[in-house]
Amino acid sequence: MVQLRRTITTNKVFQAITSTNDKVAHFVVFMWESWLFVKMFAEDIVTFRKLQANKYVLGVLICSLCASVTSEFAQSVVSRGQRVFDVKDIICNFWGSLLGVGIAFYQDR
């Protein structure tokens, strides 16, 4: 696993792709991830133990807010400091995620 992580973060082709299209990649990946997250629930209301929540609200809370910010901190650890925290990445993550949840909502209606 460590070798795989080292290969991904030091691969020159991977670095060239992500450096030129970094913000687009963040936007598209979070849009896709959020869409998948919402679509994995068959019902609009998700029940966990005694708690109930709307799957679209969960998508916004978990994907748009939590994952958007957490991923920026995690990438610094995963890349062993080669990638740094960037507020613009969080903004792209957030808006991509919102669009993904919005597309899922539109498709379900």
UniProtKB/Swiss-Prot annotation:
Annotated InterPro entries: VanZ-like
According to the UniProt record, one GO cellular component term is:
membrane
Report membrane topology: Single-pass membrane protein
Task: Tell me which UniProt keywords the record has, alphabetically.
Answer: Membrane, Transmembrane, Transmembrane helix
Question: Where would you find this protein in the cell?
Answer: Membrane
Q: Where are the membrane-spanning stretches?
A: 90-107
Record has Nucleotide-binding as a keyword: no
Q: What is this protein called?
A: Uncharacterized protein YJR112W-A
